[in-house]
């Protein structure tokens, strides 16, 4: 799902799971939460920056958050 020209975080998390060949249930287990809780967060798009950092940590990737202009400039 896309909103405007950006990908919503839930889609990024689903793509991350697919690329790592892990289920959302496995991600939830690694995060120490129930699959139902993770699915609810994905549905609501309700992740804190700290939760996103933890997702990155438990999956071995780097989380980068920044503002990006249409020109490609990021801050």
Stretches found by the model and what they are:
Residues 32-47:
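Recognition helix of helix-turn-helix/homeodomain-like DNA-binding domains
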Residues 1-26:
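A short, Lys/Arg-rich alpha-helix, primarily the initiator
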Residues 44-57:
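Short, basic-rich loop-to-helix N-cap that marks the start of a DNA-contacting helix
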Residues 60-75:
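Short C-terminal boundary/hinge segments that cap the last helix of small helical domains
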Residues 15, 29, 40:
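DNA-binding alpha-helical recognition surfaces that contact promoter or target DNA
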């Amino acid at each position: 799902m896309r909103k405007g020209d950006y990908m919503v975080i839930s889609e990024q998390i689903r793509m991350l799971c697919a690329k790592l060949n892990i289920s959302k249930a496995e991600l939830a287990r690694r995060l120490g939460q129930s699959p139902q809780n993770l699915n609810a967060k994905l549905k609501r798009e309700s992740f804190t920056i700290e939760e996103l950092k933890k997702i990155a940590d438990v999956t071995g990737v780097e989380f980068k958050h920044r503002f990006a202009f249409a020109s490609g400039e990021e801050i």
